[in-house]
Amino acid sequence: MANTTFSGPIRSENGFKNISKTASTGVIHDRTFGTSPKDARRAYLEENFLQRPGINANIDQVSTVEVQRALNRNFETLGTNYTTALTTFAVTGAGILMTTATADQDQGILLPHLDTAATAWAGTLWGTENSVHFETSLQIPALDNQKVWTGLKLTNDQLVATDDDQMFFKYQTDATNSEAFTDFTKWHFVHSIGGTDYISVLPITVATNTPYHFKIEVDSDRKAAIFVNGIQYNVTTTAGSTGGTAVTTGTTKTAALTDDVDLIPYVGIENGAAAAEAVNVHFLACSRSVYE
């Protein structure tokens, strides 16, 4: 592609996209982060983890305590047997590495600091009626005995059946302490509308140490579109809390989500055996209309 020089401002009615093309396959990827350029009709929050998130008890210590002073003010961590020390800055990638403890079903979960008035991440409502956009990038160092999930949920639980309204991506190696999937090698997209669950099996076989850029975009009709590494995928209309329906690339969105439901952004990992598992989170971002 040739370089072009402009002497005046570049104008586009619907924004710009950062596009790349895989030479071997010809597949086009939208590598845009957020909305480009940013739109004055939307509010944006972006977390690049300049500080490590810690558990709530450490964040709430008086600021004369060295551990508290070093921790992230916007995000915290929690989970079964999780401690602040289990979150480190990633050595081989950007962002943070969350590593579970070593007992079966130990967890590491990342979420906004939910104490009252602690951060705009929790004070801002990510409602289904707010045209919310969610995105994060993560990678997994190993693919054994684990469950990884990220998206917008009512609670931090990884089970499909827990939340009546939700939108999240999930990978799990087995059904232990979880629901049965038809294919445990693939990324899945789970969404629930008023207690009815839908599981889309994406044609993406999970690989180790591979960055996955997940994006969920809810439009003004409360319908969600999903993207992985800049490629849009269809969302199934077949209801079910187990198994899953295979989908392909395409533009089919969810049906209209339940109106006026405020969701919380999460990233989580749970081990499925007596061994530590980890997830590397590069960044997390959300935006919404400035007024519903």
Cite the ranges covered by each PLM segment:
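Extracellular carbohydrate-recognition regions
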Residues: 30-79
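Ligand-recognition surfaces built from glycine- and aromatic
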Residues: 246-292
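Extracellular beta-strand elements of beta-rich domains used
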Residues: 49, 136, 282-286
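Short tryptophan-centered beta-strand motifs in secreted/extracellular beta-sheet-rich domains
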Residues: 134-136, 210-219, 224-226
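Short strand-turn-strand beta-turns centered on an Asx-Gly dipeptide
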Residues: 227-231
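Intrinsic low-complexity, repeat-rich intrinsically disordered segments enriched
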Residues: 1-38
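Short, aromatic/His-centered strand-loop micro-motif at the edge of beta-sheets
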Residues: 190-213
